[in-house]
């Protein structure tokens, strides 16, 4: 099996190295990843300047572009044949709830899906320091999870699986839960401050967070020490609203 690995934290990221170790027994690995941090780039493409892939090894490339660029170039230009699976991650931080709208990690997997390739996005639901400390202990659990997911007798069509790993040592992971996206609400997420010259600047990020603890949500699973697996797809149509259009829609 031919596996494409990418991420949004960059080619040198700890999480990518852990993913390589966990996935090496799946088959032939090809790594095509950004040459620098590309977090929160979502599904953006580089359209207004050329991209320069740099070959670092027999099956290893870095690209001066976004995670989506990396997957597109890998599948359309760099690999001799398309991969059987796209694996993206392991992100240094969670991708749950609304995170998936901004995540370059999820976007890389979504680009694989858009190209017709089964895909899995993986994220560590803790901060960078905890990722550095704990990811090595989770390699065995991640390896088992990947073998299970890629070996499913009927991997769901038109679907990527969004995986979040709890921030606990590998031997404390309690199991796996199939989940839905939860909801997270940020407050005071824009910090106002001054630059060294006294000018106003705004910084996005931080603030307090409230999350949905619904029993079937990704947040609840990870909070309880489980790996969450959430199926996502490209179709953003709100079908419940579409199916009840007679209740609210009026022809202009």
Curated annotation (Swiss-Prot):
Its cofactor is a divalent metal cation. A divalent metal cation binds at residues 8-9, 39, 91. Nucleotidase that shows phosphatase activity on nucleoside 5'-monophosphates. One of its GO terms (molecular function) is 3'-nucleotidase activity. Belongs to the SurE nucleotidase family. Binds 1 divalent metal cation per subunit. It comes from Gemmatimonas aurantiaca (strain DSM 14586 / JCM 11422 / NBRC 100505 / T-27). Keywords: Cytoplasm, Hydrolase, Metal-binding, Nucleotide-binding. It catalyses: a ribonucleoside 5'-phosphate + H2O = a ribonucleoside + phosphate. GO terms for cellular component: cytoplasm. It comes from the Bacteria. Its EC number is 3.1.3.5. It is an enzyme of class 3 (hydrolase). NCBIfam families: PRK00346.1-4, surE. It is found in: Cytoplasm. This is 5'-nucleotidase SurE.
């Amino acid at each position: 099996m031919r596996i494409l690995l990418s991420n949004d934290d960059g080619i040198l990221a700890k999480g990518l190295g852990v993913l390589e170790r966990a996935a090496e027994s799946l088959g032939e690995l090809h790594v095509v990843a950004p040459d620098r941090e590309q977090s929160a780039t979502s599904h953006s493409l580089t359209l207004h300047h050329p991209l320069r892939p740099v070959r670092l090894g027999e099956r290893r490339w870095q690209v001066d572009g976004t995670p989506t660029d990396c997957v597109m170039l890998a599948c359309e230009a760099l690999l001799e044949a398309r991969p059987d699976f796209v694996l993206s991650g392991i992100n240094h931080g969670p991708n749950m709830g609304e995170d998936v709208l901004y995540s370059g990690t999820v976007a890389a997997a979504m680009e694989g899906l858009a190209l017709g390739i089964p895909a899995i996005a993986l994220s560590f639901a803790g901060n960078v320091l905890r990722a550095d400390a704990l990811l090595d202990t989770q390699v065995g659990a991640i390896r088992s999870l990947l073998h299970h997911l890629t070996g499913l007798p009927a991997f769901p069509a038109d679907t990527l699986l969004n995986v979040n790993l709890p921030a606990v040592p590998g031997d404390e992971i309690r199991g796996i839960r199939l989940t839905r996206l939860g909801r997270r609400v940020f407050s005071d997420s824009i910090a106002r401050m001054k630059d060294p010259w006294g000018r106003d600047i705004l910084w996005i990020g931080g603030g307090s967070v409230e999350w949905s603890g619904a029993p079937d949500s990704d947040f609840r699973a990870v909070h309880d020490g489980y790996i969450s697996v959430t199926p996502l797809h490209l179709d953003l149509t709100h079908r419940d609203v579409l199916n009840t259009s007679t209740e609210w829609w009026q022809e202009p």
